[in-house]
Regions:
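Active-site-proximal cap/loop segments of hydrolase catalytic domains
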Residues: 1-142
């Protein structure tokens, strides 16, 4: 979602990014990232760098752009995608956006990337996600 968010922010009213991979130039340096080089490529490879840079969401946040409302979801227990991706992307968007729409970070210090998350945490996250979307899309609930 990060790539479409930075490429065409005008197309969306609200975006939810769950456990996102946002910095395509440094992903391979954290957690499971080295295992994804075969799929994504590596910024350390001169031939692959331009392709990764071209769609790396973090590197295409533009100051003054009208970004939609965004909810990033991550947590300390994520052993796949480093939580730093969501944290730094949220901070960058908060600093750059010219819109009055919220850029929020839902951060759980005890759980992470799906599997192994207690059912009550899954439910809470689902409620938070749907509530955010209903709020930002101005959907009335009777």
């Amino acid at each position: 979602m990060g790539a479409v968010l930075t490429q065409r922010p005008d197309l969306y009213q609200a975006v939810v990014c769950e456990y996102p991979l946002e910095d395509m130039l440094r992903f391979q340096k954290f957690l499971e990232g080295p295992y994804w080089v075969a799929e994504y490529g590596s910024a350390e490879n001169d031939a692959q760098f331009p392709y990764l840079y071209a769609y790396s969401p973090y590197h295409h946040v533009k100051a003054g752009a009208q970004y939609p409302a965004v909810l990033f979801i991550t947590g300390d227990g994520d052993t796949r995608v480093a939580p730093l991706h969501a944290r730094k992307m949220a901070a960058r968007l908060q600093s750059a956006t010219a819109s009055d729409r919220p850029i929020l970070l839902l951060y759980d210090t005890k759980s992470g990337h799906s599997g192994g998350k207690p059912v009550n945490k899954e439910i809470d996250e689902g409620v938070d996600t749907l509530s955010f979307l209903l709020w930002q899309l101005k959907v009335g609930v009777n």
